[in-house]
């Protein structure tokens, strides 16, 4: 089985209990190295094959998934936050569907929730706001050289 797992918004202890279990059971883990906390890889068993997808193409990632599936391996595709929210997993799921390879999604704590917690903010307030709209800026935004407080404000 291939499972897309949400790693949470950064801190190692913000991955879900289910996500932890899937990492511990995985034979193969493909993680978004530029985004996922590498400390989470400590959960993997000793013989787990670990791939950093930061420099892999979609085709290379799929090749690892397809081969692993053919070998009967448990595969985790580890994405930051919640993979179903800006996780860029649609193209991977589409290809797996074409190949009739089963997969599932394990939700994670999204960065917008982590940002609210860090800022001690509440998104909805009775009589003030009952909705949350999630959107993002067009194009790529590098947050590497931005201070942590500013980064949290941008994320929220």
What are these regions (language model features)?
Residues 1-109, 114:
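Class I S-adenosyl-L-methionine
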Residues 9, 110-111, 138-141, 151:
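Short acidic/polar capping segments at secondary-structure boundaries
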Residues 14-16, 140-143, 147:
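Glycine-rich, anion-gripping cofactor-binding loops and their flanking helix/strand elements
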Residues 18-20, 66, 120-124, 147:
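A generic local secondary-structure boundary/capping motif
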Residues 111-123:
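Structured adenosyl-cofactor binding patch, chiefly the S-adenosyl-L-methionine
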Residues 122-143:
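Internal, active-site/partner-interface "lid" segment
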Residues 144-156:
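Single conserved hydrophobic/aromatic residue that forms the stacking wall/gate
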């Amino acid at each position: 089985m291939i499972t897309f797992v949400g790693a949470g918004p950064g801190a190692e202890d913000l991955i879900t209990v289910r996500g932890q279990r899937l990492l511990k059971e995985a034979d193969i883990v493909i993680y978004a190295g530029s985004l996922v906390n590498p400390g989470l890889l400590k959960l993997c068993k000793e013989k787990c094959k670990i791939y950093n997808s930061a420099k892999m193409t979609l085709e290379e990632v799929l090749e690892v998934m397809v081969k692993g599936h053919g070998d009967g391996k448990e595969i985790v595709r580890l994405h930051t936050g919640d993979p179903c929210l800006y996780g860029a997993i649609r193209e991977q799921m589409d290809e797996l569907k074409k190949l009739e390879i089963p997969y599932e999604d394990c939700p994670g704590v999204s960065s917008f929730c982590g940002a609210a917690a860090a800022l001690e903010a509440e998104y909805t307030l009775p009589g003030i706001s009952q909705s949350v709209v999630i959107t993002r800026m067009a194009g790529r935004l590098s947050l590497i050289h931005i201070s942590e407080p500013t980064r949290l404000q941008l994320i929220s």
